[in-house]
């Protein structure tokens, strides 16, 4: 009797997990897929932009410079409804227009969405000499009367299963455009802020 219970205890996990299909396995807090040479990742089945920027400034100075820089961006709004700490704050990109050439728009002309404004959620975490920008829930919004006329970037970049990123040439170019736009938008060291009036 004890041998049967021991064998049952040993093989019980195998019986349980044998029923689980491959696409049901979810990896939490880890990148599931990415587009090479960009900061565009598939994490928890969502497309995000996440990058750590380095700086020569300590945390307090970096906080002040980030707040000043973000205050000058027309498309950025701080989220006053979320409690922020000294080293973390949240906001939204609202109606952000891409700074892209006509060639880039023509390359991605299958939808023409690069000409529409982008809305997204932004989280910023600050430490001494570095800060991390995480942008999620990215969607293009068309200015029409129709109530639900937006398209998530996940639609373009994810495979139907949601477990991987489509690695086609237009998707890689699109991710490169996103990556370049966000790198220039949130880089404190290259921002146009000056102390001169």
Feature roles, as predicted:
Residues 1-23:
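Bacterial Sec-dependent N-terminal signal peptides
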Residues 19-197:
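Ser/Thr-rich, low-complexity intrinsically disordered terminal regions
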